[in-house]
Amino acid sequence: NTNKKLIMKGDYDYLKLLNISCVRIMKYDYLIVGSGLFGAIFAYEANKKGKKVLVVDKRPNVGGNIYTENIDGINVHKYGAHIFHTSNKEIWDYINQFAEFNRYTNAPVARYKNELYNMPFNMNTFNKLWGVVTPEEAKQKIEKEKNEAGIKEPKNLEEQAISLVGKTIYEKLVKGYTEKQWGKRATELPSFIIKRLPVRFIYDNNYFNDIYQGIPIGGYTQIIEKMLDGIEVRLSCDYFENKEELENIAEKIIFTGPIDKYYGYKFGELEYRSLRFETEELDVENYQGNAVVNYTEYEVPYTRIIEHKHFEYGPSLGKIAGGKTAQKTIITKEYPDKWIQGKEPYYTMNDEKNTSLYSKYKELADKDSKVIFGGRLGQYKYFDMDKVIIEALKCVKEELK
C-alpha cells in the first residue's frame, strides 16, 4: 500500500511528482518549524537525548533572524543587527560552547540633522546638548525642563517622554525615531509604550548594563550550524505549504512561527511591525566610523544605518582573515514598515488589544497536546537573544524530563 509505505528522505519529491500521497514519510519524535535560536537549541538538546528530529525552515538558510552571511570577508547581519548580551553566566557559557565571542561593546551614535550624540543618554550626551560638565548640572537641567512642561498625568507617548527626560532630549533623540518605528505620531501613541527612558549620569557609552557582551567571531550562522550538525534539516520548506505532508510526520511539533497563523487566524490577526533592509557595498574603507548610527529625524525615512565590519574589527578596523585590509565596506539602511500578511513580522505590538487577543490563542495552545510554541512569534513577545536561550532551555527541561 503506497499510501502507508515508509520511505527515505529524498524519495518524497519523486513521489510528489507522481502525485502519490504518503500518510507517513518518516517518523520523528519532533518536527521543529523554524531554525532560529529557539528551534535550533531544542533540536540540539533533543538530539543529544536520542530523539529523532526534523527541522524545516521556509528560508533558504538556517539561523532565523540571527543569520549572518559572509560577503567579501565581512559578516553581514542580514535581518538586522544582533548584539549578544546577558548577565546570566550560565547562558553566556552555554552560547560560548558554539563560538568564540569578541569583546564588542554596543555604543550607538544618534544623528539629529548634522549633530551627533552618544547613546544611551549619558554625560557625553548632556555635555553636547547643554554644555554641562557635572552630573549635578545635568540633573538640574533635566529637572528644570520637566518642571517647565508641568505634565502630571501623561495622556500620550509624547507627554510621557517629556515628563521623563524633558523637551530637548525628547525632540532631538526620541520623537522622530519613535514615530518612524511605530508608524504613528507620538501624540497618537499610548503613554504606556515608554515606561522609562534610561538616563545615566556617567561618561559611559556602553548601551547595555549586562556583564557579558560580544559578537561571535565569524558570525552567528556557525552557531546554528553547529547546533544542527547531524540533524535532518529541510530548507526552503514552508510548513503551511507542506502541511499535508508535515502535520502527521512527528509525535510533536515545536512551532516558532506566528501562533495566530498556526491556528488559521481563528480569533483574528495579531499585529506586528515589519522592517525593510537596503544593503549596499561601498568602495570606501570606513563609511560612518561606528557599527550603529541612529537617525532620529522623522524626515529621514530609515531609523538607522548599520556598518557591519565594525561589529568584529574594532581597533583592527579593516583587517580581515590573514591580516589583509578590507578596502570596501557594507552598510544596511533599516526602514520600519507596516506589517501585512506576506511580510516578515519583526516586532510584536504588545498593547492591551493585542495582549488580550494573544491570550485567546495561548488558551487554545495550552489545550493542544500536539504543539509547543516558542520564540518571539510563537509566544508573541519580544525577546533578547539570552532570553530566547532561557526560554528554549526551559522548554527542553519541561518536555524532555
For the regions a language model picked out, list residue spans one by one.
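Short, well-ordered alpha-helix to beta-strand connector turns
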Residues: Y28, G50, I231, I249-E251, ...
